[in-house]
A protein has these predicted regions:
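Short beta->alpha linker loops
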Residues: 56-57, 84-86
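Glycine-rich phosphate/adenosyl-contacting loop at the front of the ribokinase-like
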Residues: 1-71
Length: 181
C-alpha cells in the first residue's frame, strides 16, 4: 500500500498567511501505514514473515525507503519503482505543542493498482492496506465491489488473509462516503 517519506520540520510557531516561520530542526522518516507497520514489526522481532508491496519513484526518497526496508530485513521484492511519478512524500510541520500539519504530494502511490498484489507469498497471513483516499488507482470504481480496493480486500480474504484497512484524515473530502462506506 501507501509508501512515502515524511520530511518533518519543527517550527517556532504556525505563521499567519503570507508570513515566515522559522524551522528549528528537520529530519526525514518513513511514512504510510503499511510501511510503518512493517518496519515497526521488524524492529520488534515478532518472528512473522514481512513483505512490502508498493510503488515508489526512481529518486532519493525511493532509495531511502528501500534502505530502511533492507536495514530491518523486510522482504521488498514486491516494491516496484516507476519513472512516471516521484515517490510520495509529505512535508510535516510540527508546532511547539506537537500539533502536526501535513502537506502531501501523492506521487507514485496514485499509480499503485491491483496487479501489484497478484500472487503474494502464501506464507503471509495478514494483509494491511492503507491509505484509502490516497491510492487513486485502487480508489477507482468497480462494478462488482464498489471500488478496486474493496475488490482487493475481498481477494485477499478469499486467499485466507486476515485483512485490515487504514484511512487517511482528509477534512471535507467528498470521496470519503462513496469510497469508504
Amino acid at each position: 500500500g501507501n509508501m512515502l517519506v515524511d520530511h518533518v520540520h519543527q517550527i517556532v510557531q504556525w505563521p499567519e498567511r503570507g508570513w515566515l516561520a522559522e524551522i528549528t530542526h528537520s529530519e526525514r522518516s518513513t511514512g504510510g501505514a503499511p510501511l510503518n507497520v512493517l518496519l515497526t514489526l521488524a524492529k520488534m522481532h515478532v518472528g512473522l514473515p514481512l513483505q512490502a508491496v508498493g510503488l515508489i519513484g526512481e529518486d532519493s526518497d525511493g532509495d531511502y525507503i528501500l534502505a530502511m526496508l533492507d536495514q530491518y530485513h523486510v522482504n521488498r521484492q514486491r516494491v516496484q519503482r516507476t519513472t512516471f511519478a516521484p515517490t510520495s512524500m509529505s512535508q510535516v510541520m510540527t508546532d511547539p505543542s506537537g500539533q502536526r500539519t501535513f502537506f502531501h504530494s501523492p506521487g507514485a502511490n496514485r499509480l499503485l493498482d491491483l496487479p501489484a498484489f497478484d500472487r503474494l507469498d502464501g506464507a503471509m497471513k495478514i494483509f494491511h492496506l492503507g491509505y484509502l483516499l490516497l491510492l487513486d488507482s485502487l480508489d477507482m470504481p468497480d462494478d462488482e465491489y464498489g471500488t478496486r480496493s474493496a475488490r482487493l480486500l475481498a481477494q485477499m480474504r478469499d486467499q485466507g488473509y486476515e485483512t485490515s484497512l487504514d484511512l487517511v484524515s482528509r477534512k471535507g473530502d467528498p470521496r470519503y462516503q462513496p469510497l469508504v462506506l
